[in-house]
Amino acid sequence: MPEHPNQAFQGEVRKTVKKSTPWWPQRTQAPPSAPNILVVLFDDVGFSDFGCYGSPIKTPTIDRLAAQGLLYTGFHTTAMCSTTRAALLTGRNHHSVGVGCLANFDSGFPGYRGKIAKEAGTLAEMLRPHAYRNYMVGK
């Protein structure tokens, strides 16, 4: 969704790019006190694999990150990555946002449409109006 959907283009389009003037709307600025948000998702590990959760395995970098942030102790996961990803991205039960099964598989029934419903909203969509930007690395 565009950040400024109703704002008219204020640049100039001419016969060539060189003679044209690009334009971008001014971005919303986050207040200086706005915290950074970093979500790190690990694949195929359990909470007992990290030192910050009491494991004897040494994980100093993860432990330092954990000491400066939040540690979750109760997150429901399923045996499928699509459903867990939907819950993580929205903060809601995966059925309630339309991903009760594999992504891109639409069963034709509510809760099993195979994609996150537009009206569900993701964390990134909820933070965008507050000047947050997101970036994802990985699979």
Across the structure, where does each feature detected by a protein language model lie?
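Formylglycine-dependent sulfatase
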Residues: 1-139
